[in-house]
Swiss-Prot record:
Activates expression of the rhaBAD and rhaT operons. It comes from Yersinia pestis (strain Pestoides F). Residues 174-272 form the HTH araC/xylS-type domain. The record marks D241, D250 as: Interaction with sigma-70. This is HTH-type transcriptional activator RhaS.
Length: 273
């Protein structure tokens, strides 16, 4: 597995933060690094496989990667990212309490993926632009200013995550996307789901396609296929059981869709493991 080292990304040993733009981000194999990373999705779509678990990416996704996590990007489609790198939450000279504004693992569950709305993405652009420039010098005042901008960015993201589920159409769409991520195996009737999240059905179709580049049904099918691939790799369940566990009513139809998506059958994938 590829290991990325801080010496290759930070401008100096004293630099607390580095910015790496990916415009666009192509598929990138599984890797980990000796620093922390905040991945901000500005445009496009793709799949982020984080510690073996697949997550679909779209505009407004924010992913928090620790120094012991492993991840990769695949199925990218005009995926524009800004990566904010920092050495560790406790590695700043003048900041304390950074961990308060980062995801915190609870009972073995790490909420690595957040969402923020378009307004927050616009608000943080100037902060990212400031962070792109290394501190003017190694003087303490320049390091302190640079770190303070990073804290502003972190607070903006944290506030944006807390408020993105607001009572407007964009917030309700984000709630729906999160619901699909966690309930992909359930039978979905789109008119009922639209009512549940107080979205007109046509608005749901239009906005979901704008966010993900896919129709709602295509998006759900892809979620299910990604989860099925994960189970094929990491569980002992049979192909038939996995098909039903991931929301497919027919294992033959599942195999057809799987081969179309990944260019190999479920059994062929299993045989390679």
């Amino acid at each position: 597995m590829t290991v990325l080292h801080s010496i290759d990304f930070f401008s100096s040993s004293s630099a607390p933060v580095a910015i790496e733009a990916r415009a666009p981000q192509s598929a990138f194999p599984e890797h980990h690094h000796d620093f922390y990373e905040i991945v901000i999705v500005e445009e496009g779509a793709g799949v982020h496989v984080f510690n073996g678990n697949p997550y679909t990416l779209s505009r407004g996704c924010v992913c928090f990667v620790r120094d012991h996590d492993r991840h990769l990007f695949e199925s990218t489609d005009d995926l524009f990212l800004t990566n904010v790198l920092f050495r560790a939450p406790d590695a700043f000279r003048f900041l304390s309490g950074v961990g308060h504004f980062l995801p915190r693992e609870c009972d073995g569950v790490y909420p690595s993926h957040w969402r923020v709305n378009g307004q927050v993405l616009q608000q943080i652009k100037c902060l990212i632009a400031c962070l792109e420039h290394a501190p003017k010098s190694d003087q303490v005042e320049d390091i302190a200013l640079h770190e303070s901008v990073f804290m502003q960015l972190l607070v903006k993201l944290w506030q944006g995550c807390q408020t993105q589920a607001g009572d407007d159409q964009e917030g309700r769409l984000y709630q729906l996307l999160d619901w699909l991520q966690n309930n992909y195996s359930e039978a979905v009737e789109w008119p009922e789901l639209a009512d549940r999240f107080a979205l007109p059905l046509r608005t749901l179709h239009r906005q979901l396609k704008n966010k993900t580049g896919m129709t709602p049904q295509r998006y759900l099918t892809r979620l299910r296929l990604l989860q099925a691939r994960h189970q094929l790799c990491y569980s002992d369940n049979s192909v038939t059981d996995i098909a039903y566990l991931c929301g497919f009513g027919d294992s033959n139809h599942f195999s057809t869709l799987f081969k179309r998506e990944f260019s190999q059958s479920p059994r062929d994938l299993r045989s390679q493991l």
